[in-house]
Amino acid sequence: MTTIETTQGLERRVSITVPAETVTTAVRDELKRVAKNARVDGFRKGKVPAQIIEKRFGASVRQDVLNDLLPRHFFDLAFKEKVNLAGRPTFAVENYEEGKDLQFTATFEVYPEIQLQGLENIKVEKPVVEITDADVDNMVEVLRKQQATWAETDNAATKDDRVTIDFVGSIDGEEFQGGKANDFVLAMGQGRMIPGFEDGILGHKAGEQFDIEVTFPEDYHVENLKAKPAKFAITVKKVEVMVLPELTADFIAKFGPNTKTVDDLRAEIRKNMQRELKNALTARVKNQVIDGLIEQNQIDVPFAAVDQEIEVLRNQAAQRFGGNGEQAAQLPRELFEEQAKRRVQVGLLLAEVISSNELKADEEKAKAMIEDIASAYEQPAEVVEYYSKNNELMNNIRNVVLEEQAIDAVLAKAQVTEKASSFDEVMNPQA
């Protein structure tokens, strides 16, 4: 009887013996196969004597046989013992002598056995939001600002204006690297600069020259500037005011072929806001459920699964910045370790929710999700057809739907409270 030993955490070790007869037969068969195609000077193909084949190819054949026997016998055992394997095993050969049993150990990780608990202790706050006319008004203003133009003014700069400036920064009378710029365009009121910089410009007009004194934040990204007091000599070259477009037919037409009036535009905006709100609410509830699941179910995760997830995150990070696989490997694993561990935890816990509740992806919900995605495009019917003909995309949608069903299954047992909220509170929680 084979005994699988627990070494630590999710790591397991097992000793496996392969009978000498099995090894001998495998070596003999492989030598015969090699002999059929071996080319040795002085002999015809396939007619090389066995002792020469053994002398020339014996060592490499035995290594090839070993490389085949180790994983084959391990995976046979893993299947027989119903091992929930995580990652690849490592092998240590203890005996591999001719005519004797092959003895080796395999060290491997398994996925944790999960018994979900504490679902009734999970607390979820569910925002209840109604999109108001004022919310739509605000979004109309956002769209107008996105299409705004700028006009020069002789007035003093305000927090809603844009300025073009030259500046030179110094610390203790010495200029510092990165502290100088010409024709620098700065949109006021957005907090792009260090504290006090924009405030020092407010109230000044084009053509004015002046100095301001500020202090770099203690957490500033440049080490030698942290918490340092600095002086900036500033020249205001231009002050511009924002000119918002009127709600003309031309402006309205930019937002779709079916938007012809202000009412059409507002209806389209409201529909988009409802879609964005739905996604935001789903994400907020999902995050609370996942946080609760992890808090109530502390589980070990396999190092192999975390390592695999780290590589995924590394490659995604490299691609975002235009890099490749080689550059991804240079990114420190510490940057991704916590996120990778959490993703593995979430995957395992949700998989257990799905399994224990015997959930299957609801095809009607998948169809509704595709239609919702398609509604954001000018030709929704074409988008729906594209999804329906792409198996990979359809499977991705089904996986998302299945995950949502798992979240709903947890919600059904959790402590859910509703809280009246505004659109802005949900969409801009950090504001």
Swiss-Prot record:
Its EC number is 5.2.1.8. It catalyses: [protein]-peptidylproline (omega=180) = [protein]-peptidylproline (omega=0). It is found in: Cytoplasm. It holds the Pfam family FKBP_C. The keyword Cell wall biogenesis/degradation does not apply. One of its GO terms (biological process) is protein unfolding. SUPFAM superfamilies: FKBP-like, Triger factor/SurA peptide-binding domain-like, Trigger factor ribosome-binding domain. Residues 160-245 form the PPIase FKBP-type domain. It comes from the Bacteria. Keywords: Cell cycle, Cell division, Chaperone, Cytoplasm, Isomerase, Rotamase. InterPro entries: PPIase_dom_sf (IPR046357), PPIase_FKBP_dom (IPR001179), Trig_fac (IPR005215), Trigger_fac_C (IPR008880), Trigger_fac_C_sf (IPR037041), Trigger_fac_ribosome-bd_bac (IPR008881), Trigger_fac_ribosome-bd_sf (IPR036611), Trigger_fact/SurA_dom_sf (IPR027304). Belongs to the FKBP-type PPIase family. Tig subfamily. Consists of 3 domains; the N-terminus binds the ribosome, the middle domain has PPIase activity, while the C-terminus has intrinsic chaperone activity on its own. NCBIfam families: tig. HAMAP family: Trigger_factor_Tig. This is Trigger factor. The lineage of its organism: Bacteria, Pseudomonadati, Pseudomonadota, Gammaproteobacteria, Pasteurellales.
